[in-house]
């Protein structure tokens, strides 16, 4: 496979042509990097415009983003974990919560009367090791917040077993 036919080459070429053709925006021209920048800086600058909202400073708390401006928060409440997600644009029949392989996934799809998709939502996260995956429950409140709870396994004291085995030759 030639390097000119690789998907990385096509993506870079496409990005360069779209960047150079959008001369109407002065902000995109000011963000253009010279050719001598290291590859990682170039890659970061290419994607930071599209994905910059996902990069959180280390000082911000970790939360589950629901919508721009609305974040869900994970909490430990006694013997359970709980997090909420803003789903006010969706009705209960639009929302599907699934658990699999120690992960939880929230998906929603709002359809228009003509069958076209008006709005979608998807979030997937890994459950902590001490969660019972069969105990996951969800409830949609009247204010549109979806609350998901999962029970923690009872804390058991881990006792390291020590033993010795002799094998006769």
From Swiss-Prot:
Residue ranges of the sHSP domain?
61-169
Top-rank taxon:
Eukaryota
One Pfam family it belongs to:
HSP20
Record keywords: Chaperone, Cytoplasm, Nucleus, Stress response
| Region of interest called Disordered, as start-end residue ranges on this chain | 1-37
SUPFAM superfamilies noted in UniProt? HSP20-like chaperones
Q: Which PANTHER family match?
A: HEAT SHOCK PROTEIN BETA-7, HEAT SHOCK PROTEIN BETA-7-RELATED
Q: What is this protein called?
A: Heat shock protein beta-7
Q: Which organism is the protein's source? A: Mus musculus (Mouse)
* Gene name per UniProt: Hspb7
């Amino acid at each position: 496979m030639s390097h000119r036919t690789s998907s990385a080459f096509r993506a870079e070429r496409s990005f360069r042509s779209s960047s150079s053709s959008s001369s109407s925006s002065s902000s995109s021209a000011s963000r253009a990097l010279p050719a001598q920048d290291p590859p990682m800086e170039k890659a970061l600058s290419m994607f930071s415009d599209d994905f910059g909202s996902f990069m959180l400073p280390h000082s911000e708390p970790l939360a589950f983003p629901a919508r721009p401006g609305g974040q869900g928060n994970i909490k430990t409440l006694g013997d359970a974990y709980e997090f909420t997600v803003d789903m006010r644009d969706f009705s209960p029949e639009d929302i599907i919560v699934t658990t699999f392989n120690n992960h939880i996934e929230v998906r929603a799809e709002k359809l228009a009367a003509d069958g076209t998709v008006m709005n979608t939502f998807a979030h997937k996260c890994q459950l902590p090791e001490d969660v019972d995956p069969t105990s996951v429950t969800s409830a949609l409140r009247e204010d549109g917040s979806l609350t998901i709870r999962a029970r923690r396994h009872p804390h058991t004291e881990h006792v390291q077993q020590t033993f010795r085995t002799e094998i006769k030759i």
